[in-house]
Amino acid sequence: AAHDAEIQIAGFGSDRLQLFPFQRAGVAYAMRQMGFTSDGDGFWHQTTPMTGGVLVGDEMGLGKTSQGLAILKATNSFPAVLVCPASLKLNWKREAEQWISGVQVKVLSGTTGNLPDADIYVINYDILTHWTDKFVSIKGLVLDESHYIKNGSAQRSKACIRMADKVSEGGVRVCLSGTPIVNQPLEIMTQLRVINRLDDFGGATSFRGTYGRASAKSLASLNRKLRSTCYVRRRKAEVLTELPPKRWAHLVVEGDPAVMKEYKKAEADIVKYL
């Protein structure tokens, strides 16, 4: 993968908040593989009609979040649905509001309710199945920690596929995971289905037949095919010189309602005791 690229995205980042060189290269790769080109002034257009998305597989800590947001903004893929683990929802909201000027982000919770107006909807995997039917059409879909859908028969995986099918023409589908394959190659199939890339591998039956057995030869072949179509991955060791010193931040984590109820009760009991 390239180590840098000259890209501009109108309304993304600021003088103090910019992508690192390898992140720019990752976004440039994604845009190229999805058929988008820049006009040079920060605006991008899909000059080659394509429906396939991308999978950003950088190691943990290399900023897949900002790359995912950059892709959404560059392609103007709003409204977008961003699916992530429950513990990361508020972090995604905060990051989106920092990176994208004027964006309206809504965090969806619970299993019922009306769909508010928003540019980005942040929702966790566990409740997605209850919300999919509320969306008629979307322009962008991002799955964070996309290995959560490694089991294609799980309800969360089926819900993600239904959401992917709601992405309109010219929209984008993006998977983010530092471990897209945890144990065996077949675990990446659902992710490829979500980003509409499974046909690049001959379809589900062909994929199983070619990569079902995790031999060194088949894994090497899969890696080459992924990188040539939809996959970019960098390791920390490869971009160490570009990384800033460690930064510490206080993150607010949304707790499970049932757990928080017990926590509040315990807190009140302690206050009463004191």
PLM regions and their residue ranges:
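Conserved P-loop NTPase motor "coupling/switch" region that bridges the ATPase
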Residues: 78-80, 140, 157-238
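Walker B catalytic acidic pair
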Residues: 144-145
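Inter-lobe connector of SF1/SF2 helicase motors
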Residues: 176, 235-274
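Conserved helix/coil segment N-terminal to the catalytic DExD/H
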Residues: 112-140
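Conserved helix-turn-beta segment of the N-terminal RecA-like "Helicase ATP-binding" lobe
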Residues: 88-111, 195-198
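Walker A/P-loop NTP-binding motif
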Residues: 31-35, 63-79, 161-166, 195
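Conserved Walker A/P-loop ATP-binding site and its immediately adjacent core
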Residues: 78-98, 182-187
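Conserved pre-motif I regulatory segment
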Residues: 2-56
